[in-house]
Amino acid sequence: MAFQKILNFCTNELGSFYLDIIKDRAYTCHHDGPARKSSQTAMFHLLQMLIRWISPIISFTAEEAWKEFSNDESSIFEKEWYLLVEPLESDLDVWNDLINLKDEVNKNIEILREEGSIGSSLDAEVHITFSENDFLKFSRFGEELKFLLLVSNVSLSVSDKDLDEPKIDIKVSIDEKCERCWHHVADLSDHEGNKICSRCISNLSFPGEARQMI
């Protein structure tokens, strides 16, 4: 049971969601900027917990991982259970809803991909029509929503009718692709022979772009 829960967490929440999302921060944000450091801090805490979780199940792997990850000479089996210094306030229901929304967006993108209309999800622009309650729930993410859904642009609206499920419309972006982050953006600038977006230009110098730390 414990092994299955850990495997599901690594496959679903990490592999299919979080790690996919933070690639943009890891590869395109300033290397010492707060946006990239935020995701690195999250990964640090995740590894602290994950190595402890797997230690009773795959002990040698856990010990090897601990030696690579930590400068601590002691064994992982000498460590206490890892707890964050301060508990994080997070609305888990909203995040579960966001994962479900991302799954639905991906299904729609996959249909276009099978038709040959689209390649990468970053080729897509998404418009989502919500009920009023769902609009308030998701609009709080602002510009961060396009990074969470791995698309180039997201626009939201409120339906004048009752909706049980969000209505998702996807179109292929007509904007040019930034040569650095691969997002499609209306206005690109020439920078040392490369056509890149204003976000990437800001990320070339410290501290880089301002992002919600999620």
Give the positions of each predicted feature:
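Core structural elements
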Residues: 4-26
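Residue-level signal for inorganic ion chemistry
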Residues: 14, 59, 109, 181
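Acidic, turn-prone loop/beta-hairpin segments
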Residues: 19-108, 115-130, 155-157, 162-168, ...
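Glycine-rich phosphate/diphosphate-binding loops that line cofactor/substrate pockets in enzymes
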Residues: 113-118, 175-178
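Extended, charged helical/alpha-beta scaffold domains that provide interaction surfaces
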Residues: 123-151
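C-terminal edge-of-domain segments
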Residues: 141-177
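Cys/His-rich metal-chelating microdomains
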Residues: 184-187, 203
